[in-house]
């Protein structure tokens, strides 16, 4: 179990990921996996086509403050080509490519983010009849991010729609209140159920560690507030999967150790006792185990592909291997020589207790 009461970073280092993670190419067997599960499609354009903008305008938030986004503009010929293609992509995301609704859809805006490894474009699609809009993202395809998206889709309570086309990645927009804004504007509100929020942060912390999903600083997750009988429930969702099984420091896979999340950690320590924290950790691992068993063949296929994929450096693999060995006191970690092997061992060690309790027959078989 992860100890929330030991929330000070024992490694003596600032809990900050590497400033620049390299982009790892999608190897052929991962590409075949994506095709088998309907994740690879043929697009009429690529990420590189979107880079041919002519100028940008900085975007500000509703309070007039600068954001990391810029609105981009294209020459007329380029814009006409992109508009049709981007509406088609939206149809693929939402209606399996049914273009019968495309006539009342249009591209309202394209934004570019210069911050982050994937340098995403955010596409705003608008319904011309009622002005309702939606977003999706176009990024550089990266093997780390693909593994993170797949693991989140399979092991977490959240389904994710995305697809690839060669070196281009299309991701749906994950709605919610950005974590940093939630901490700033909502966490102290009188109607915030702090016990339920603390419970969800414990579960989110556990999911990230079991999946080895790193860098969950507050701007890399969103919070959903769900009305429930007489109160609210909360769901914290990761929105950035760039740091899947890349970093060497164990605490980078634990949201509780990021300074940005200190207010959530304090809430856990104030409202939950040790037994309650352990209960919620066990609940989350049990549900992850159900999902793992239900999708065991797909998970095995993915982990076998990840097994020999080079998605980190030898130094980081060695550092994480040693840290997990010390944490679990399990020599099985010392046999791993890739991040994929480490993750496979980590899933077994984290969920073995719960796997033993799974029924051998029935709906989970």
Language-model segments: which ranges?
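Short C-terminal domain-edge/linker segments immediately following a structured domain
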Residues: 153-156, 167-172, 201-204, 254, ...
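Conserved kinase catalytic-core segment
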Residues: 189-250
